[in-house]
Structures are given as C-alpha cells and as structure tokens.
Amino acid sequence: MEVNVERLKELRRERVLSLRELEGKSGVSYNTIWRLEDGRQGAHPRTLRKLAEALGVAPSELIRGGGDTDG
C-alpha cells in the first residue's frame, strides 16, 4: 500500500516521537519506519495497522488518498 509519507511524519512529530520511540510503541522496525517516511517502500496492511494504533489514528489516515481531511 502506498503510504502518505507527509501524514506519517506529521503524526509522529505531533506526538513528539522519534523513530526509535515509534518503533517501541508499534513493534515496527526503525529501518522500516525510516524507509516508509523516506518514500522508499510501501507498507503491508499489518504494518499500517501497527503504526496507526501506535499513533492513535485510523489506518486509512496513513494511506495516500485514504484520509478524509475535508471536515
């Protein structure tokens, strides 16, 4: 799945989490998170679910074109 890179970074920064801290909260490896944020790879649905849960959002918010931001 194509990750909304900017949204992932924004959510992590809003929660004042480093990549290592997000790794600890989500169980997703540092390298995977780094590659996702850098746009170097897509994500499996399970990975998106883990990241979304750690960030307190719906998985759809992390998918390009998946988050409803129109109010």
Language model feature labels by segment:
Residues 40-53, 69-70:
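Short, basic-rich loop-to-helix N-cap that marks the start of a DNA-contacting helix
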Residues 56-71:
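Short C-terminal boundary/hinge segments that cap the last helix of small helical domains
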Residues 9, 20, 49:
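Residues within the helices of the helix-turn-helix
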Residues 16-35:
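Short alpha-helical DNA-recognition segment
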Residues 1-14:
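A short, Lys/Arg-rich alpha-helix, primarily the initiator
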Residues 6, 16-17, 43-46:
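Residue-level signal for the short linker/turn that defines the boundary of a DNA-recognition helix
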Residues 12, 23, 52:
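The alpha-helix within a helix-turn-helix
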